């Protein structure tokens, strides 16, 4: 995943495997990080239906698209190792316009 198991500390970028989740989603363009705000919430029980609700927000759709392309190996053929243990079931993109955009309608 890109963190130590013992202390849950982030592994330095040079030492992280190329397929770690952090390596696949901690992307930079022109030296600047592709910023997103993310929140996740686990649901269910260990013995029953269970999973993780994940929501991300960003100013540009490009940021999330690049992360997804990287996770699924479309950029360099290396897939996020987390995908060996998880199963994406559904997803969606939603546009939340600014107040200025709404007022201009």
Go through each PLM region and give its residues.
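Long, histidine/aromatic-enriched segments associated with O2/redox biology
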Residues: 1-105
């Amino acid at each position: 995943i890109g963190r130590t198991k013992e202390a849950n500390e982030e592994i330095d970028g040079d030492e992280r495997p190329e397929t770690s989740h952090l390596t696949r989603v901690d992307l930079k363009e022109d030296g600047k990080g592709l910023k997103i705000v993310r929140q996740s919430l686990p649901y269910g029980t260990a013995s029953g239906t269970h999973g993780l609700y994940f929501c991300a927000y960003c100013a540009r759709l490009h940021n999330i698209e690049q992360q997804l392309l990287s996770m699924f190996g479309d950029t360099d053929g290396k897939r996020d190792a987390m995908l060996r243990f998880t199963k994406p079931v559904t997803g969606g993109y939603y546009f939340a316009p600014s107040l200025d955009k709404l007022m201009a309608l």
